A protein has these predicted regions:
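Acidic, Ser/Thr- and proline-rich intrinsically disordered linker/docking segments
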Residues: 2-17, 23-136
């Protein structure tokens, strides 16, 4: 149950596009865009996206919000460095949250297999908010 999320970012009046196939999680921070594809977490620093170095955080997240359906849960948490992390997670794929070596891990199911993704900087309060959102 993948979906394509298309981003647009205005660069000097030009609107380049990038389509990303998202399986379970899409995470956007002020510096990075992460997404799951084929059961693996992919991460790219913004400046590595060819001509996308001037991507706007608010622009990206607002477009994802418009494209997200009821099947996706939008989480917004603030990490220990006071940076906002936005998670867009398929509701039916969320398994839970785990903690290992001081880092939290989001656990999701992908094709019948449980996978976990480390979320660096996620505070205890932020982790609690994630769990509470899925318990509602």
């Amino acid at each position: 149950m993948s979906k394509f999320v298309k981003f647009e970012a205005q660069i000097d009046g030009y609107l380049p596009e990038l389509s990303v196939k998202v399986d379970n999680i899409l995470m956007v921070t002020i510096d990075d865009v992460y997404f799951t594809q084929g059961g693996k977490l992919r991460g790219r620093r913004t400046q590595d996206w060819n001509d996308y170095s001037t991507w706007n955080f608010e622009c990206i997240t607002s477009q994802i919000e418009e494209l997200s359906t009821d099947e996706w849960i939008d989480l917004s948490v603030v990490d220990s460095e006071n940076k906002t992390k936005r998670f867009f997670i398929r509701e039916d794929s969320f398994v839970g949250l785990d903690s290992e070596n001081g880092y939290y891990k989001l656990m999701v199911e992908h094709n019948g297999v449980n996978l976990s993704y480390e979320v660096r900087g996620l505070t205890r309060k932020g982790a609690r908010e994630v769990v509470e959102t899925f318990e509602d």
